[in-house]
Amino acid sequence: MTIASTPLTTDRAELLARLAQPETYDLLIIGGGATGLGTAVDAVARGFKVCLLESHDFAKGTSSRATKLVHGGVRYLAQGNISLVREALHERTTLLNNAPHLAQPLPFVMPSYRLLDTPFYGAGLKMYDALAGKDGLGRTEFLSKDKTLRLLPTVRTDHLKGGVKYWDGQFDDARLALALARTAAAKGALLVNYCPAKELLHTDGKVSGVVCEDAETGTRYEVHAKCVVNATGPWVDLFRQQDAEMLGKPVKPMVAPSQGVHVVVDREFLPTDHALLVPKTADGRVLFAVPWLGKVILGTTDTPRHDLAREPEAFEQEIEFILKEAGNYLCRRPTRADVRSIWVGMRPLVKPQDDDGENTKKISREHT
């Protein structure tokens, strides 16, 4: 029996009826964030029969709690990770071309307060341009003090020497995730949210599906597949551990979770269409102040987090850190009372071998 489905149907009964059919999928994906949804689109576009299960809303976790940037990794360039920067720049181009309604170029300005800052950082950003090649969004430009102030009118003026302007991208993370979900559904994939995978199924010592549960009714379903993809982000080790226990094999954690806090303040702190880049914070990271929907996003942090909360909360010291670091570059320092919103994204960083995962700032952002 075949049940027709419109793209990303909201008819719960129809979705569950499809889920209950005795079907063996080519690919079963656990997790409806950017990775899971992207995998679903790729697989179904190649003709595979795909089912995706999500325990909450699509893009509930990290995939809707980003800094809203499509960047090639300026910080990674400073670390000498050229291959990662080149890959990120390629992906930036792909996203800008594929979703121009959700992703656009964004100019950034890095103010300089020491005489050598402009040539030092400018040279690095020129290399950024070179790595982007024909896919560059605009040329890096060395700025005078006056032009820096025209582009960033609220930046701190004392000891300001000039600045550097470069280009990267900005996107709507949550809308992109939903666009991926709709695309996958339109091509025939079955996507069901609020239906968490509860346990893995095994056949001949290999994972062959999951038992999932409708969060509304508690009804359980067995879903079988030739291949199961664990795309649960920071929670990936929970299923890996379950699989290991079932097979009686030890397994080491793969992920070192890290949280990134974002603070939103009013646009008056940065009344411009240019983003501000703080090249080096007290903990050695970069910090962004990014215009977004009439407000300004300040962030982010990199703090190890092991409790894997579904609704991670910012530590007060993280909020104060962001406000202080941003305030060092603004003529008016934002205070705790100026904060309009806060969100936290969890990074599923791949833990290096023989590493306790406590210094997440140094963990590579490359995939394994």
Regions found by a protein language model. Give the residues of each.
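Core beta-strand elements of the Rossmann-like FAD/NAD(P) dinucleotide-binding domain
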Residues: 23-25, 216-227
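Extreme N-terminal leader/targeting segments of oxidoreductases
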Residues: 1-27, 42-46
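Glycine-rich FAD pyrophosphate-binding loop
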Residues: 44-65
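Dinucleotide-binding Rossmann-like beta1-alpha1 core, especially the glycine-rich loop
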Residues: 68-151, 287
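Flavin (primarily FAD) binding-site architecture
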Residues: 230-247
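Flavin (FAD/FMN) cofactor-binding and adjacent substrate-gating region
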Residues: 112-187, 192, 200-206, 293, ...
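C-terminal catalytic lobe of FAD-dependent flavoproteins
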Residues: 175, 183, 244-368
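Short hydrophobic core segments
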Residues: 29-30, 223-233
